Structures are given as C-alpha cells and as structure tokens.
C-alpha cells in the first residue's frame, strides 16, 4: 500500500477514508478494519500539525480532515492523539484553522472553493467537538464551526461557481454527522 496524500483540494486521503469508512460500517466490516489500520499507520504518529492552509483554492482542510478521520478510528484514544496533533488548538492555534477563509471573488471557479473550505471546516470542527464533548477544545471547536458557517453559508446561492456544488458540503458529506 502506498503512502497517504495530504495535499488539499479534492485529493485528500483522510477525507476519502472518512467517507469510505462511514459506508463500510454498514456494508463491509473487513474494509473498516483495513481503513482503521491504514489510518493508524499513516496518521497515528502525526504531531504538531502546522496547518499551512489555505493555499488559495482548496475546499478541504488537510489538518481537520485528518483529525476527523482519527476521531472515528481512535474512539476513546482520540483525545490523546488530538492533544499532540494540534497541541495549541484550545488557544486557537494554528490560527489558520480558526479563521474563516476570505473569498475575494465568488465568480472565480477556483477562489469560490474557499467557501467550500469554510463549510468543510465547519463540519470537521462540529464533528471534533462532538467526539470530545468534555475536552476543553469542544467550545472552541463549536465557535470555530459557527464562524466558518457564518462566513460562507449566506453565499451558497451567490454565483453558479459555488451554487452548483457547495450545497453538497452544507448537507454534510457524511451520513454519520
């Protein structure tokens, strides 16, 4: 098996594994086992995530998609993993994960992806808060989710460049959330 892809845009192994795992929970237990093993191999030792994002036109957060996947894979062990993966998250750092992306031109097909980034980050932050309800990150994550939704939700219908696909992220990419 090859290595993971952590680049942004639509090439994101953690995002793909999250969706595949959600499907496999109902249809293919052996696939869940394989996905969990790969996720642990590829992401289990990640520490001190820098979160160098956004890059300008992606709609997925590589850092938060990874955290979302690991919340499902690790269960009760997720809190310990999260604390070393994003050790300053409770303090709102790295700031790039807590600050909604600014969309300068919603008619530009690439820049409009940043509304998608805000929506997918909101989904990830809400899921992380739900996975860690007693953790100090929970209220911080909920606030970040609300901020990201507020930045992009009102613009779902502003221009065709976003309208034709952004609603898919708003309705939640995963039936488990």
Q: Language-model segments: which ranges?
A:
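Aromatic- and glycine-enriched pocket-lining scaffold segments that form the walls
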Residues: 3, 8-43
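Eukaryotic acidic, Ser/Thr-rich intrinsically disordered low-complexity regions
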Residues: 160-172
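Long, repeat-rich segments with strong aromatic
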Residues: 36-151, 155, 159
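Conserved small/polar residues in nucleotide/adenosyl-binding loops
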Residues: 1-9, 170-175
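Tryptophan-centered motif/residue detector
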Residues: 10, 80-84, 165
């Amino acid at each position: 098996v090859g290595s993971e892809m952590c680049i942004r845009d639509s090439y994101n192994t953690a995002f793909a594994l999250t969706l595949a795992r959600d499907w496999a929970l109902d249809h293919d237990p052996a696939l869940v086992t394989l996905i969990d093993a790969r996720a642990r191999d590829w992401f289990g030792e990640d520490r001190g995530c820098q979160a160098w994002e956004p890059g300008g036109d992606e709609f997925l957060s590589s850092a938060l998609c990874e955290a979302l996947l690991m919340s499902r894979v690790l269960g009760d062990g997720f809190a310990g993993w999260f604390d070393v993966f994003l050790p300053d998250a409770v303090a709102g750092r790295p700031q790039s994960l807590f600050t909604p992306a600014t969309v300068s031109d919603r008619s530009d097909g690439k820049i409009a992806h940043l509304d998608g980034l805000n929506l997918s980050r909101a989904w990830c932050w809400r899921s992380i808060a739900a996975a860690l309800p007693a953790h100090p990150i929970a209220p911080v994550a909920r606030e970040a989710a609300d901020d990201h939704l507020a930045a992009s939700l009102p613009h779902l219908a502003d221009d065709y460049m976003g309208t034709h696909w952004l609603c898919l992220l708003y309705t939640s990419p995963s039936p488990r959330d």
